[in-house]
Amino acid sequence: VNKMKPKALFVMLILWLSFTTIQARSTEDVPDKGTYAKFLLVGCYMKPDEEGVRMYRFDGQTADVDYPCGLRGISNPAFLTSDSTGNRIYAIGDDEGKSSTANALLFDKESGLLSLLNSQSTDGELPIYITLSPKEYFVLTANYKGGSITVFSQDKKGKLQRDTKIIRFAGNGPNKKRQEQSHLHCVTFTPDGKFLLATDLGT
């Protein structure tokens, strides 16, 4: 499948995790460097033995960037999302076969370190997008080559469970080279949380 990928390694989504060291202070206080610190999470097309998820610390006052850590263990974690707290990060494994995965990560705000909680197969090849349900009970992936959406539940610690539900799409489109089958690109909920929307390149 001729799936379009960006030419650069640094990919698709940069998460601005706007937490860290902001504290109440008067307008006369001189802010220290940490006051403006934000974390950037970058997903990359990289092999599992490389740091495909990268954490950068960005200073909003000086625009200085440093690289405190990265995370190995995921094949092509090219799209990331976070929960509402910023403590849990979710990444796709944009690959085929057993390497087609959804991945749950923990982010420690104090240390700025990432850790991999667990990975589960999407049972749909080339997952390209990942999102959370409105109440964050479920994690969903859009699987490009699989032509499907995979729905994962999570336990209280944020680990993805194996009891998946798969929504499969069928059909094709007028461009026989690109639309020979369903190719899911994105899945998201409407603002009221009542409906799930999906975009399909293949039909």
Descriptions of predicted regions:
Residues 28-58:
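An edge-strand/N-cap motif at the start of beta-rich repeat modules
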Residues 34-36, 82-86, 132-136, 191-192:
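Residue-level detector of Asp-centered blade-edge/turn motifs that repeat once per structural unit
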Residues 36, 49, 75-78, 126-128, ...:
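Beta-rich catalytic cores
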Residues 112-186:
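Asp-box/WD-like beta-propeller blade repeats and closely related beta-sheet repeat scaffolds
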